[in-house]
Amino acid sequence: MDSNTVSSFQVDCFLWHVRKRFADQELGDAPFLDRLRRDQKSLRGRGSTLGLDIETATSAGKQIVERILEEESDEALKMTIASVPVSRYLTDMTLEEMSRDWFMLMPKQKVAGSLCIRMDQAIMDKKIILKANFSVIFGRLETLILLRAFTEEGAIVGEISPLPSLPGHTDEDVKNAIGVLIGGLKWNDNTVRVSEALQRFAWKGSNENGRPPLPSK
């Protein structure tokens, strides 16, 4: 196993632990808590794939971070922070909409790269809106946290989520997954629209690579 893969996992585990302690003091906002929950699932998946114990990895990650901080001057830290591009977190969904359980009468699931697409094929003749929570950098979607399809009544009928065991995806991966979800939902004569934020940052409102723009609400 590559040593960089192991040390990266160890550092991620320790940093998650620090963020969890921060959240336990009721200091985190909704996007912070959302990322914390998602990252926990991702770490569990990575730990299972790598065959590493999370508690042991957290202790090792702490030692790595402490060593780095001992060698880091305040001035170097300021320069590093200033040079890192800042991403924005956009939320179409509330925390309740993101965490709500949902069920499918006729479930269909497909994996596209590192994204899992789920939809209920029993849904027919409905008006559906796609909402997503995601981060944006340089004017483009950076990381999809979660996308869900809602009927006008508020029922969840579809979802696109990152696979915890396969972290990392591009905006092109998200576009392809959205296309699959829309195609599946339209099969039963449903009308599908997307949120304005998703339209703007995932599709950029243009015909990139021959795709028509998605209909927005």
Curated annotation (Swiss-Prot):
Compartments reported by the entry: Host nucleus; Host cytoplasm
Key words, A-Z: Eukaryotic host gene expression shutoff by virus, Host cytoplasm, Host gene expression shutoff by virus, Host mRNA suppression by virus, Host nucleus, Host-virus interaction, Inhibition of host innate immune response by virus, Inhibition of host interferon signaling pathway by virus, Inhibition of host PKR by virus, Inhibition of host pre-mRNA processing by virus, Inhibition of host RIG-I by virus, Inhibition of host RLR pathway by virus, Interferon antiviral system evasion, RNA-binding, Ubl conjugation, Viral immunoevasion
GO molecular function: protein serine/threonine kinase inhibitor activity; RNA binding
Pfam families membership: Flu_NS1
Main location, first listed in the record: host cell
CPSF4-binding, as annotated region: 180-215
Post-translational modification: Upon interferon induction, ISGylated via host HERC5; this results in the impairment of NS1 interaction with RNA targets due to its inability to form homodimers and to interact with host EIF2AK2/PKR.
Residue positions of motif Nuclear export signal: 137-146
Stored InterPro entries: NS1 (IPR004208), NS1A (IPR000256), NS1A_effect_dom-like_sf (IPR038064), uS15_NS1_RNA-bd_sf (IPR009068)
Keyword Ubl conjugation carried by entry: yes
Positions of the UniProt region annotated as RNA-binding and homodimerization: 1-73
GO biological process entries: symbiont-mediated suppression of host cytoplasmic pattern recognition receptor signaling pathway via inhibition of RIG-I activity; symbiont-mediated suppression of host gene expression; symbiont-mediated suppression of host mRNA processing; symbiont-mediated suppression of host PKR/eIFalpha signaling; symbiont-mediated suppression of host type I interferon-mediated signaling pathway
Top-level taxonomic group: Viruses
Annotated motif Nuclear localization signal, positions: 34-38
Main function: Inhibits post-transcriptional processing of cellular pre-mRNA, by binding and inhibiting two cellular proteins that are required for the 3'-end processing of cellular pre-mRNAs: the 30 kDa cleavage and polyadenylation specificity factor/CPSF4 and the poly(A)-binding protein 2/PABPN1. In turn, unprocessed 3' end pre-mRNAs accumulate in the host nucleus and are no longer exported to the cytoplasm. Cellular protein synthesis is thereby shut off very early after virus infection.
Domain observations: The dsRNA-binding region is required for suppression of RNA silencing.
Family note: Belongs to the influenza A viruses NS1 family.
Oligomer status and interactors: Homodimer. Interacts with host TRIM25 (via coiled coil); this interaction specifically inhibits TRIM25 multimerization and TRIM25-mediated RIGI CARD ubiquitination. Interacts with human EIF2AK2/PKR, CPSF4, IVNS1ABP and PABPN1.
UniProt name for this protein: Non-structural protein 1
Organism, as annotated: Influenza A virus (strain A/Chicken/Pennsylvania/1370/1983 H5N2)
Primary gene name: NS
